[in-house]
Swiss-Prot record:
The protein's name in its UniProt record: Thioredoxin reductase 1, cytoplasmic
Cofactor(s) the record lists: FAD
Record-annotated disulphide pairs: C209-C214
Gene expressing this chain: TXNRD1
InterPro entries reported for this sequence: FAD/NAD-bd_sf, FAD/NAD-binding_dom, FAD/NAD-linked_Rdtase_dimer_sf, Glutaredoxin, GSHR/TRXR-like, Pyr_nucl-diS_OxRdtase_dimer, Pyr_OxRdtase_I_AS, Thioredoxin-like_sf
Record's keyword terms, sorted: Acetylation, Cytoplasm, Disulfide bond, Electron transport, FAD, Flavoprotein, NADP, Nucleus, Oxidoreductase, Phosphoprotein, Redox-active center, Selenocysteine, Transport, Ubl conjugation
Note: The thioredoxin reductase active site is a redox-active disulfide bond. The selenocysteine residue is also essential for catalytic activity.
């Protein structure tokens, strides 16, 4: 389904003038010549177009003579967006480009008085003023515009679409939006298709988080923590055999069984909500139309009033000899049918450090090759402490090197690989042999092969990310986007879920609540877990100035770790306060066990405007790690010692 470009109004000429201000004989067009859709009534007063009274009458004639009138300026971006909106709805409209009209300046002044609008565009629908760019888009998003257009039903409005909403991507955000929209009685379809990795790995419904991200990562992190707990248990009186071994195959089987149950649960939930699910690859082929191709190559065409892009990201490859042939990514690791053995992890992202951490935690020989800094975008003080802790626990780091070639020495499960790497600041070349090489150098948005250029959706050409409004709307009014593919937004599963639900509520339930992307809590599940909310120290200095922030910090020693006497003065707490705003806490950071559990509650406090004084007045729970935040007294600026002798300070 779709609509022909330039539909006629009342069987007349195309609805949008493309005359560039001239008529057939080359004369500059007068406002009186602009009537392509319907024949305008004769000038009721017989005035010349230069008179204010006549201008008002002429403008009123346009408004009365057409179902949809857009007073526009040809060079105005907002005007173009409004015209695209009506085109996308297949609704005929009349446009008067005032900058291409002989008496346009006078008409614009009169229009300002008549419509009480100070800028263009100005839109009228069925003789009712909708307003400018913002009010028009808002009326569309709330459904008021569509209802008004269908009053007395013009014959040339499009037929109903196949669906109210088609969602491309069956990850956490897309599924949340689908179920929420269906709850309001909307007809919803989800298209989800997993392109296999270079090694052929595929998975089921649920997206990255469920299949190859948060869920298996946390479970394997738990496997590593249990190994540490077994060691600690001897100090608590448990008689554990000295030769405790980890069974990779059993762990993978358990993890994949759990993921399989989640995949099935999602399909059941969609069915119960009456959401149509197709395991097919979605590509836009025209306005409001999409092609769905299944794994057998069978194609179907669907139409929808609105679309939501929730395609997520996939791991990036190095583009060097041997990377796709011999290396794995996180997309492969969590279902790897054999123990990876001696492993090189390439990258310094949270994915790289988390995977390196749990692989080392189950007893493997792990090396991390780092191009520059650890955990780019995170607080670097915390990132460096994580790196130090990992090194102290046997994980090796090769810093300021990048692989330039990966070769297979011996095939097998695992086999043997040779990695050739070059220094980032010299000509030095090094080589190393590993059983497995895992790439975790970043992720790319899945936006370049879904036909966005066909419907005019803008993306950042460098990153593939999609810029959106604060309501997750792309530059094409009927297409929205959420999740990791958004430009300059937090890439976290709960954020995508929240954005998806709120979007559906705005579109179909009359809500005006938008997703708040500020002060989003997160946790990095490295061996020493890192929880954070708000600004990093670097960002706080950049935003408020070093002289206007105060950093309170302290090491702490979890009581549970005192009996095995390990990792004293490794756990660390830090808050960053804005001294110009009553020492409001603008950054919260913690390294230690259960960091995510600790951070979650404090995130709510930060959203409520938590101050240092309020923290100080809070009585802590003893003995727990989180109580350290109620007793922070040493500032970084002071340089005083923050070492702890025991769990009670």
């Amino acid at each position: 389904m779709g609509c022909a470009e330039g539909k006629a109004v009342a069987a007349a000429a195309p609805t949008e003038l493309q005359t560039k201000g001239k008529n057939g004989d080359g004369r500059r067009r007068s406002a009186k010549d602009h009537h392509p859709g319907k024949t305008l009534p004769e000038n009721p007063a017989g005035f010349t177009s230069t008179a204010t009274a006549d201008s008002r009458a002429l403008l009123q004639a346009y408004i009365d003579g057409h179902s949809v009138v857009i007073f526009s300026r040809s060079t105005c971006t907002r005007c173009t967006e409004v015209k695209k909106l009506f085109k996308s709805l297949c609704v005929p409209y009349f446009v008067l480009e005032l900058d291409q009209t002989e008496d346009g300046r006078a008409l614009e002044g009169t229009l300002s008085e008549l419509a009480a609008e100070t800028d263009l565009p100005v839109v009228f629908v069925k003789q009712r003023k909708i307003g400018g760019h913002g009010p028009t888009l808002k009326a569309y998003q709330e459904g008021r515009l569509q209802k008004l257009l269908k009053m007395n039903g013009p014959e040339d409005l499009p037929k109903s679409y196949d669906y109210d909403l088609i969602i491309i991507g069956g990850g956490s955000g897309g599924l949340a939006a689908a179920k929420e929209a269906a709850q309001y009685g909307k007809k919803v379809m989800v298209l989800d298709f997993v392109t296999p990795t270079p090694l052929g790995t595929r998975w089921g419904l649920g997206g990255t988080c469920v299949n190859v991200g948060c869920i298996p990562k946390k479970l394997m992190h738990q496997a590593a923590l249990l190994g540490q707990a077994l060691q600690d248990s001897r100090n608590y009186g448990w008689k554990v055999e000295e030769t405790v071994k980890h069974d990779w195959d059993r762990m993978i089987e358990a993890v994949q069984n759990h993921i399989g149950s989640l995949n099935w649960g999602y399909r059941v939930a969609l069915r119960e909500k009456k959401v149509v699910y197709e395991n097919a690859y979605g590509q836009f082929i025209g306005p409001h139309r999409i092609k769905a191709t299944n794994n057998k190559g069978k194609e179907k065409i669907y139409s929808a009033e609105r679309f939501l892009i929730a395609t997520g990201e996939r791991p990036r490859y190095l583009g060097i000899p041997g990377d796709k042939e011999y290396c794995i990514s996180s997309d492969d690791l969590f279902s790897l049918p054999y123990c990876p053995g001696k492993t090189l992890v390439v990258g310094a992202s949270y994915v790289a450090l988390e995977c390196a951490g749990f692989l080392a935690g189950i007893g493997l020989d792990v090396t991390v090759m780092v191009r520059s800094i650890l955990l780019r975008g995170f607080d670097q003080d915390m990132a460096n402490k994580i790196g130090e802790h990992m090194e102290e626990h046997g994980i090796k780091f090769i810093r300021q090197f990048v692989p330039i070639k990966v070769e297979q020495i011996e095939a097998g499960t695992p086999g043997r690989l040779r990695v050739v790497a070059q220094s980032t600041n010299s000509e030095e070349i090094i080589e190393g042999e590993y059983n497995t090489v895992m790439l975790a150098i970043g992720r790319d948005a899945c936006t370049r092969k879904i036909g966005l250029e066909t419907v005019g959706v803008k993306i950042n050409e460098k990153t593939g990310k999609i810029p959106v409004t604060d309501e997750e709307q792309t530059n094409v009014p009927y297409i929205y986007a959420i999740g990791d593919i958004l430009e300059d937004k937090v890439e976290l599963t709960p954020v995508a879920i929240q954005a998806g639900r709120l979007l559906a509520q705005r579109l179909y339930a009359g809500s005006t609540v938008k997703c708040d992307y500020e002060n989003v809590p997160t946790t990095v599940f490295t061996p020493l877990e890192y929880g954070a909310c708000g600004l990093s120290e670097e960002k706080a200095v950049e935003k408020f100035g070093e002289e206007n922030i105060e950093v309170y910090h302290s090491y702490f020693w979890p009581l549970e770790w005192t009996i095995p006497s390990r990792d004293n003065n490794k756990c660390y707490a830090k808050i960053i306060c804005n001294t110009k705003d009553n020492e409001r806490v603008v950054g919260f950071h913690v390294l230690g066990p259960n960091a995510g559990e600790v951070t979650q509650g404090f995130a709510a406090a930060l959203k409520c405007g938590l101050t240092k004084k309020q923290l100080d007045s809070t009585i802590g729970i003893h003995p727990v790690c989180a109580e350290v935040f109620t007793t922070l007294s040493v500032t970084k600026r002071s340089g005083a010692s923050i070492l702890q002798a025991g769990c009670u300070g």
